[in-house]
Structure formats: C-alpha cells, structure tokens
C-alpha cells in the first residue's frame, strides 16, 4: 500500500491515513493520496503480467493492504459504437460495459473497495442512503464480508 495521506477535496487539508474518517471538517469527501514513485517500483509490466485481471491487479494504487472483499470483479471492455457515432455526427463513440461486474453496475468497484476498507478497520455494520445500484452492491459485498 502506497497511501501517504487523505486530503479534503475542497480545502486540501490533510488527514491521517489508516484511520476511519467520514467527510472532512468542511463536509467534503476525502481523496486518497499516494506515493506514486514508490508504487512505480513494484508496479511494472512484468509484475502486472503475472496477475489476475480485475481491479485488484492494481493493488499498489488502492488504499488497502489486506485480502480484498471480492465477488470476481472483471476488467470490463470498452466497446466501439460506430453506427451510433455516424448517426449522431461523431467521429467515434466508445462505451464501457460495466454491466459485466458482479452486481451489474459500476457501483460494484467502489463498494468492493469500501467494504474491503470497512473490514480492514473492523467495522461490523454498514448503512447508506440509496434505493438503487449502490444499495445492491453494498448488500452483496457486505454479505461476502460477513458485515
């Protein structure tokens, strides 16, 4: 793990990594900051070639250092839609097919990471205000983690 600190997305105020936080004192999300030079030492073409595909392949650029909570997240394809592009006067149109993720939504990636971090910090209950894909992803990953 190459996390150096967390940073308020509005003010830039620094927060200690490795602790549970909610929002910043300004009420804004906290961004994870990394030592990219340290990550580059182990994140090489050779090291990536031997890893299983998916988001956890990039572990040096993720804020966890234990076993991930996973439902088998795959690398999802970027698909060209030339007919739609031509119809709409665009030179090209690309879409990312996130429906192939375990819960059918891009929300799976974020919630996989959130539940992984919650488990790492010893959290045993999680709730979030949602009536959509995020709730389904949280339920699935929470169940996998035993939370």
Question: Each predicted region: which residue ranges?
Answer:
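PLP-dependent amino-acid enzyme catalytic core
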Residues: 1-147
């Amino acid at each position: 793990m190459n996390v150096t600190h967390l940073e308020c997305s509005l003010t830039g105020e620094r927060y200690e990594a490795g602790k549970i936080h909610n929002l910043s004192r300004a009420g804004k999300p906290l961004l994870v900051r990394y030592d990219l030079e340290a990550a580059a030492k182990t994140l090489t073409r050779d090291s990536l070639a031997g890893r299983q595909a998916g988001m956890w392949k990039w572990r040096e650029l993720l804020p966890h250092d234990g076993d991930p909570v996973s439902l088998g997240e795959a690398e999802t394809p970027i698909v060209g839609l030339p007919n739609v592009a031509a119809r709409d006067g665009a030179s090209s149109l690309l879409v990312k097919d996130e429906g192939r993720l375990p819960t059918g939504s891009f929300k799976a990636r974020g919630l996989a990471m959130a539940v992984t971090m919650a488990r790492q910090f010893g959290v045993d209950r999680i709730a979030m205000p949602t009536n959509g894909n995020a709730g389904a992803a949280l339920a699935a990953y929470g169940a996998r983690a035993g939370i």
